[in-house]
Amino acid sequence: MSDLSHIRNFSIIAHIDHGKSTLADRFIQHCGGLSDREMAEQVLDSMELERERGITIKAQSVTLNYQARDGKTYQLNFIDTPGHVDFSYEVSRSLAACEGALLVVDAAQGVEAQSVANCYTAIEQGLEVIPVLNKMDLPQAEPDKVAQEVEDIIGIDATEAVRCSAKSGLGIEDVLEALVNGIPAPVGDIDAPLQALIIDSWFDNYLGVVSLVRVTQGTLKTKDKIISKSIGKAHVVDMVGVFTPKRHVTGVLRAGEVGFVVAGIKEILGAPVGDTITHSNTADVKALPGFQKVKPQVYAGLFPVSSDDYESFREALAKLTLNDASLFYEPESSDALGFGFRCGFLGMLHMEIIQERLEREYDLDLITTAPTVVYEVVTSDGTTIYVDNPSKLPDVGFIDEMREPICEANILVPSDYLGAVITLCVEKRGIQKNLQYVGSQVSVSYELPMNEVVMDFFDRLKSVSRGFASLDYNFVRFEAAKLVRLDVLINSEKVDALALIVHRDNAPYKGRALADKMKELIPRQMFDVAIQAAIGGQIVARTTVKALRKNVTAKCYGGDVTRKKKLLEKQKAGKKRMKQVGRVEIPQEAFLAVLKVDS
């Protein structure tokens, strides 16, 4: 379809569980993208993990042909986006390829913080946003109230919002009509030199690198010689097509269209996300503004349980990085765990997902150390360094000032749960910045230390608000704070992988809690195991795992007491010798226990 006026590129913005993937299923069914036999629930959530957790992680794309009421056939290019706060970078990437977005809001639950944040991103990128009220089949749906909320919180006129139910299929055609009429057609010159944006790339074992692209001008055909601007190496295009959602080879993509391209690129970094593709003979075409690089917020060490897996672990990470541009990694070695990688993630969910994908898709056994955020440290000679690993922190004597990252958290919560949410934020050392009532909800914004937010704040927030509160946060600045490194010593030996950076006021409490937790998890040995928590040279907590001991006097019947004493002394000497040479194996649960210690 070469007529640009009949193309619509759009994505769907929605909070988790507001029915985005189900709505996509209905679009595919309505436009005949798959036969009824092939329809599975949540077609676009193709990763096993996505279906299991019921969330969208990776952006997907699908091209559909829709016969509109005005008799014309439109080509709809839909780019699916995730809704969870940790995957917001995927959203900004998908939006860069669209002219419009559907804002899907649950008519029973109302607006949630994440949709608000993504909606603002869309408006900033100049997209046309069309509100849709979903789940109209629910008895508790309140469309008028929710439409008013959309207007109050986001500032979009929602009086004309389309009402539908993705589950029952009610109003799906109205949504498609609103989409065709409300979202502008793409602009682009088909005869100009090729310029295409890589939205996503992934590695296929048979095809090499597959890239999802949006062509902004020109035409991309099979057998073309293309280069990506940042790398400049020429490749010949083997396959061009669209997803319907199955791979469908078309042989050509024109300006305004979204599809996939395979060019036999075998090296993993051959087609970086956000790069511009053009023909090798028009290499001077202006590069499109890519996406801002996302900075990881949480760092953790990942180590293979068996050191033989190190190479396959490195390859697995390289393949995942291609598909997930926000994952950062560098080699790291630890005394306790051997060789592994220090990885940077966008949040705790992202970290869990990556670890699960590595274990499932690449069949690896991994140990994860406690996650930390990045701290800014001013040393005594005036240089500023960034520390993302507690064991790399300089000694107390060399530190002039430590600064922790502060983020602004925007929370939307029903007014009944406001008290509990405020209590939680205060407990996490938060400073209230703003509070306003919007309908039956309250919008609160707090400045909170990032390390308090990334650990377990999201889970705690959900539990104190019975799952109704929603959260969106972004980094603001570094701020000076009284921070110290808490070391864990086992039999007077520091275990680098268990070190933590904590606030000085919480340190003794955290140290005690950590020592007690370790006592539960470290199995009893044949000798006493002393567990200590220390700040610098000062021990703030200590506990002992008592030794297992054999009853050596069992064989003595009566007789002289000196006989028993001799046997006990002999046992004592043996235990003492054992303690000097014995090593304590620390189980994987102990490394994870660091996360579970309530701050």
From Swiss-Prot:
It holds the Pfam family EFG_C. GO terms for cellular component: plasma membrane. Its EC number is 3.6.5.n1. GO terms for biological process: positive regulation of translation. InterPro entries: EF-4, EFG_III/V, EFG_V-like, G_TR_CS, LepA_C_sf, LepA_CTD, LepA_IV, P-loop_NTPase. It is found in: Cell inner membrane. Keywords: Cell inner membrane, Cell membrane, GTP-binding, Hydrolase, Membrane, Nucleotide-binding, Protein biosynthesis. It comes from Teredinibacter turnerae (strain ATCC 39867 / T7901). Required for accurate and efficient protein synthesis under certain stress conditions. May act as a fidelity factor of the translation reaction, by catalyzing a one-codon backward translocation of tRNAs on improperly translocated ribosomes. Back-translocation proceeds from a post-translocation (POST) complex to a pre-translocation (PRE) complex, thus giving elongation factor G a second chance to translocate the tRNAs correctly. Binds to ribosomes in a GTP-dependent manner. Residues 5-187 form the tr-type G domain. The keyword Hydrolase applies. Belongs to the TRAFAC class translation factor GTPase superfamily. Classic translation factor GTPase family. LepA subfamily. Transmembrane segments: none annotated. It is a peripheral membrane protein. SUPFAM superfamilies: EF-G C-terminal domain-like, P-loop containing nucleoside triphosphate hydrolases, Translation proteins. It catalyses: GTP + H2O = GDP + phosphate + H(+). GO terms for molecular function: GTP binding; GTPase activity; guanosine tetraphosphate binding; ribosome binding; translation elongation factor activity. GTP binds at D17, H18, G19, K20, S21, T22, N134, K135, M136, D137. The keyword Cell membrane applies. This is Elongation factor 4.
